[in-house]
Structures are given as structure tokens and as C-alpha cells.
Amino acid sequence: MLKQTMPLLFETLSQYPVVCARIMGSQLNPNLKGEVWVYPFLEGSLLVADIQGLPFSGFYGFHIHQTGPCVVGEGYTGFRGIGGHYSPTEQPHPYHSGDLPVLMAYYNHAFMIVYSDRFVPSEITGRAIVVHQFPDDYRTQPTGDSGGQIGCGTFYPCFEKNPTRPSGPARTSLPT
């Protein structure tokens, strides 16, 4: 299976992503930034995440939330109005569509490629992707005990902001 999937994976990553998000840090984590690119792949989506400025090396919860945009509220340490984890079929945690594997940071940087068959790119356009301060424990309801929101980005069709195509951790960032 891997021998058959790898060429498709490389072909997919050589294309432009369909949905993108630029991650910004919360008021308590202003140096956190990054990008997430989403590609259609098999029966779902392939997500590529590159996040810098994480507070420490370790694990962080990583979830798609119900709505965007990500707005930092005055006097509020997270992001306002993004709702709970994305769950169109109202599944309990960790089975809802917005559940993603934890981000693993080393020297304040995390890079991840993950496949999900729980959604296609068009279903997450306009929704928020959130980095949480603690790792998801995959048990506690409704959020996996992943703590506060330290970073957030809103998914948009990539062509709207003319992103550069990702080419790995050393690529150019999205234009401002």
C-alpha cells in the first residue's frame, strides 16, 4: 500500500494547496506564527502545518474549530467567537472532524503532515485552526483538556491571498 500511496502523496504536495490558514499568536504569545495548507487527498484532506514561536519544546493540542475568523479580544487571552471543535456529525471527542494529532514542537518549531478522512478542504473554509497550550489527552470531554488557545488561523481559499507553494520547513512564508 505504501509503495502505491507515496507517488500520489508526492504528486499532491507538488500542486498548489486548496485551502490555507495563516496562524497568529494570542496576546500572551505574540511571537507564535505559522501556516497550514490543505490539499484534497484520497477521500479526505492532507494538512501541512508549519508553526514557529511555540513557547516550549513539547506537545500542543491542534484542532479545527466551528467558525472563524480568529479575533483577539481585548482583555481575553484566547480568540473570540470561534466556537467549539468542528463536529458536523456531533461526535464526542476525539472522534469529531476537528480532532487532529497533537503538534510536536522541538526548539519552539513544529512541522507536521497529516491525513484526515473526516473532511474535505471545502468543508473547513472559513473555520478556525487552533493551537492549544497543552496536548490533547484524547479522552476528556469536550476538548481533550488541551487548555487555552495560544494560536489561531482562519482557513480561506488559497487563491484569495496568492500563497507561495510550501516546499518544506525552509520555504518562503505567505505574503502579507
Which residues are covered by each model-predicted region?
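N-terminal leader/targeting pre-sequences
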Residues: M1-T176
